């Protein structure tokens, strides 16, 4: 059984969020919270919130044991890009892309044996 949590259109670049997601993929849930709390990246609190939501979904919706959970999938997809312009010299403007992310975390119970 798997429980899933998704944060959509989060205002952080996918490239930066993937750096943090790569640290926690495949580890036990308790260990991941410690890693996220001590990682000085802007994506850490956002990913921690999504992980807490996935654990809560597993506990309340599927009656899974919280101490026996493992992250089976964790990935960041690209969301819609907000296009902005920065004024430049001589009446020109240059584009600024404010990127967003869709963060997905899937937890499942450890296999016995």
From Swiss-Prot:
GO biological process: translation
Listed Pfam families: Ribosomal_L22
Keyword presence, Transmembrane: no
Record GO terms (molecular function): rRNA binding; structural constituent of ribosome
Matches recorded under InterPro entries: Ribosomal_uL22 (IPR001063), Ribosomal_uL22_bac/chlpt-type (IPR005727), Ribosomal_uL22_bac/org-type (IPR047867), Ribosomal_uL22_CS (IPR018260), Ribosomal_uL22_sf (IPR036394)
Entry keyword Disulfide bond: no
PROSITE patterns noted in UniProt: RIBOSOMAL_L22 (PS00464)
Cross-referenced SUPFAM superfamilies: Ribosomal protein L22
Keywords, in A-Z order: Ribonucleoprotein, Ribosomal protein, RNA-binding, rRNA-binding
Record-level GO cellular component terms: cytosolic large ribosomal subunit
Subunit annotation: Part of the 50S ribosomal subunit.
UniProt-listed NCBIfam families: rplV_bact
PANTHER family on file: CHLOROPLAST 50S RIBOSOMAL PROTEIN L22-RELATED (PTHR13501), LARGE RIBOSOMAL SUBUNIT PROTEIN UL22M (PTHR13501:SF8)
Family as reported in the entry's similarity comment: Belongs to the universal ribosomal protein uL22 family.
Function: This protein binds specifically to 23S rRNA; its binding is stimulated by other ribosomal proteins, e.g. L4, L17, and L20. It is important during the early stages of 50S assembly. It makes multiple contacts with different domains of the 23S rRNA in the assembled 50S subunit and ribosome. The globular domain of the protein is located near the polypeptide exit tunnel on the outside of the subunit, while an extended beta-hairpin is found that lines the wall of the exit tunnel in the center of the 70S ribosome.
Name recorded for this polypeptide: Large ribosomal subunit protein uL22
Source taxonomy: Bacteria, Bacillati, Bacillota, Bacilli, Bacillales
């Amino acid at each position: 059984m798997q429980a899933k949590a998704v944060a959509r259109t989060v205002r952080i670049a996918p490239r930066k969020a993937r750096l943090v997601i790569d640290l926690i993929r495949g580890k036990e849930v308790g260990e991941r919270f410690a890693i996220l709390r001590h990682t000085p990246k802007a994506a850490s609190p956002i990913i921690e919130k999504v992980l807490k939501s996935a654990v809560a979904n597993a506990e309340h919706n599927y009656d899974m044991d919280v101490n026996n959970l493992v992250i089976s999938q964790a990935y960041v997809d690209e969301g819609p890009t907000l296009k902005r312009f920065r004024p430049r010299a001589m009446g020109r403007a240059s584009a600024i892309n404010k990127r967003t992310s869709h963060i997905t975390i899937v937890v499942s119970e450890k296999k016995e044996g």
